[in-house]
Curated annotation (Swiss-Prot):
The keyword Cytoplasm applies. It comes from the Eukaryota. Belongs to the CNEP1R1 family. GO terms for biological process: lipid metabolic process; positive regulation of triglyceride biosynthetic process. This is Nuclear envelope phosphatase-regulatory subunit 1. The lineage of its organism: Eukaryota, Metazoa, Chordata, Craniata, Vertebrata. It is a multi-pass membrane protein. InterPro entries: NEP1-R1.
Amino acid sequence: MNSLEQAEDLKAFERRLTEYVSCLQPTTGRWRMLLIVVSVCTATGAWNWLIDPETQKVSFFTSLWNHPFFTISCITLIGLFFAGIHKRVVAPSIIAARCRTVLAEYNMSCDDTGKLILKPRPHVQ
């Protein structure tokens, strides 16, 4: 394979990688916004639950029943983590890290957007 074909292959690989990473960005942004909203709701509900004087006087389950906003938001947050939201919010970083691992064998790397970084060849003496 001559160097022109190799360069074309590298360019095609880089285009495909940047395309894939950029296609993940909108979805990742939506998952991040959902996680932020549910986290803020859970924190707000937890604050209201903790400062309520009735919380100390009643049983735990009665206290949760008296604070449905906190209960629902907490269950939603737990459900999101079981559904894998912690992986979805960092999906482009995971893809880039895995590509870096593979590309390291070929003296290459890539940034978080998928652009290839060519490293100089090691000099053998």
